[in-house]
């Protein structure tokens, strides 16, 4: 893995991340393909909207279809028909999401399979082994996502467990001679000094990139902004910086302003399937009756396949009728919007006009999609 910092503007960074399956221009938004597919999108459609890298989910792919199946294809790229880079999360967040169904110990996490109830055990070592079979370009360490709310003692205990798991993840990654990139994840809840302690330990271990985890897990926006503003500038400047699970277009712009390079979130795809569409001039809900006879495109400034060919009225009809095509066209548009946003931000940083772009972005988004 190689990361080049190409330019900066008002704290924002323009870079290039070179991975085993290609180069990724940053800042970058990564669509989420939990089960080896970005919902309602073919790989060709994903490429057409400008996606450079996508996510796979270690936890879910381990459970179904299983490592033997993916391994028989030589890894996740061939299995899902995607020849560009893939990042896999470690399974830590999914285990965290199981709540009472899981039991965390020093060794790892015991839990009941959400598919068939089978008793399973996931450890840092097993997570690294799974991700090595998946052959993802970026591997994430196995950590515990600190819940919100958490007392200081709870956050400290969770972070220090993640710190020990980070060491074990690194050791197993090296033992496996995995030639891909391994990212560490900074935890520590809503406590700045715990975030600093986590980052220091991760730097001592050594990773190819650094992520901020444990945000956008239910905390108030002010707390998220505070921890992001504190933590992001402290991440190593010569390594890629990744804000996990974030977020809205505004969240992404705020993250980039704080020096973040990489983002992922289910929001554009999940919202698309629910008829919530993002545009340059605000968001709209296509199910609303106001769109029933509206012959305009979603966004006259958008060049996506959906906006070039279909009206709001047709998309409203598809959504009301429950047609699969509605989810597909909505997802094409939302992902194209996110990819266009990050492409424009890359250009603005390169031209040293990031602050001007953000001012215009906020003004346009505030007008409301009419």
Curated annotation (Swiss-Prot):
Record: residues binding Zn(2+): 302, 304, 307, 333
Gene Ontology molecular function terms on file: metal ion binding; tRNA-guanosine(34) queuine transglycosylase activity
GO biological process terms on file: queuosine biosynthetic process; tRNA wobble guanine modification; tRNA-guanine transglycosylation
Similarity comment: family membership: Belongs to the queuine tRNA-ribosyltransferase family.
HAMAP family documented for this protein: Q_tRNA_Tgt
Entries under NCBIfam families matching the protein: Q_tRNA_tgt, tgt_general
Record protein name field: Queuine tRNA-ribosyltransferase
Species of provenance: Azoarcus sp. (strain BH72)
Organism lineage: Bacteria, Pseudomonadati, Pseudomonadota, Betaproteobacteria, Rhodocyclales
Recorded name of the encoding gene: tgt
């Amino acid at each position: 893995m190689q990361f080049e910092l190409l330019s900066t503007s008002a704290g924002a960074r323009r870079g290039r991340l070179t991975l085993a399956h290609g180069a990724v221009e940053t800042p970058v938004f990564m669509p989420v393909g939990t089960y080896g597919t970005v919902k309602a999108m073919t790989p060709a459609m994903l490429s057409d909207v400008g996606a450079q890298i996508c996510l796979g989910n270690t936890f879910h792919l381990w459970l179904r279809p299983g490592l033997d199946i993916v391994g028989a294809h030589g890894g996740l790229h061939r299995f899902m028909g995607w020849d560009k880079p893939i990042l896999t999360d470690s399974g830590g967040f999914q285990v965290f999401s199981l709540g009472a169904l899981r039991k965390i110990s020093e060794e790892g996490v015991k839990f009941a399979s959400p598919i068939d109830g089978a008793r399973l055990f996931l450890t840092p070592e097993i997570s690294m082994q799974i991700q090595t079979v998946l052959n993802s370009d970026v591997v994430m360490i196995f950590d515990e996502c600190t819940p919100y709310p958490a007392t200081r003692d709870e956050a400290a205990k969770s972070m220090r467990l993640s710190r020990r798991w980070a060491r074990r993840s690194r050791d197993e990654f090296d033992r496996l001679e995995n030639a891909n990139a391994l990212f560490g994840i900074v935890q520590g809840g809503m406590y700045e000094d715990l975030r600093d302690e986590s980052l220091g330990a991760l730097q001592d271990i050594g990773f190819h990139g650094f992520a901020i985890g444990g945000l956008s897990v239910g905390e108030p926006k002010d707390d998220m902004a505070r921890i992001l503003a504190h933590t992001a500038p402290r991440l190593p400047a010569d390594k890629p910086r990744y804000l996990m699970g974030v977020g809205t277009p505004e969240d992404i712009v705020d993250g980039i302003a704080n020096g973040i390079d990489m983002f992922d979130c289910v929001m554009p795809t999940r919202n698309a399937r629910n008829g919530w569409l993002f545009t340059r001039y605000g968001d709209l809900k296509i199910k609303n009756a106001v769109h029933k006879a509206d012959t305009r495109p979603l966004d006259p400034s958008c060049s996506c396949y959906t906006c070039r060919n279909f009206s709001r009225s047709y998309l409203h009809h598809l959504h009301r009728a429950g047609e699969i095509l509605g989810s597909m066209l909505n997802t094409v548009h939302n992902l194209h919007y996110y990819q266009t946003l990050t492409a424009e931000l890359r250009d603005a940083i390169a031209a040293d006009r990031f602050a001007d772009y953000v001012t215009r972005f906020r003004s346009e988004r505030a007008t409301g999609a009419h």
